[in-house]
Amino acid sequence: ITAEGVTIIASNPQGEILLVRHSYGPQGWYFPGGGIGRKETPEHAARREMREETGCRVTDLKLVGILNEEISGAPHRAFIFSTVVDAAPEPDGREIVEARFFAIRLLPEAMSALTRRRLELWQSSVN
């Protein structure tokens, strides 16, 4: 059985991208995202995760690509969406301790290989 999840790459009008830091797991910066519920479409899951993790409501989601990968030895399918967000993120303080925009050339060092792969997919879709 392949687990499915969503990743949302949100940029602001200045072209900066939104990253979040979790209160659990390996410390570092990630794109907002999470699992897809049993009766949920990937797009609905993306909207829900953005709202839960950043407080931002998104209207215009674009599917950038689908990555089939292995996470912790198990098959995983990730639906990667992009959107533009105008509002300042407000992390919930429980699951997400920090959410902020970064300029592309000033991204934090502490980003996982999975996060970087998603960034590359997005960058190749934009150019």
Residue spans for each PLM region:
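Conserved N-terminal beta-strand and adjoining loop/helix that marks the start
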Residues: 1-17
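A generic structural signal for short beta-strands and their flanking turns/coil linkers
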Residues: 4, 25-27, 32, 59, ...
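Conserved Nudix-box catalytic region and its N-terminal flanking loop in Nudix hydrolases
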Residues: 12-52
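A periodicity- and composition-biased signal for non-globular, repetitive helical segments
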Residues: 27, 123-124
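Unchanged
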Residues: 36-59, 65-123
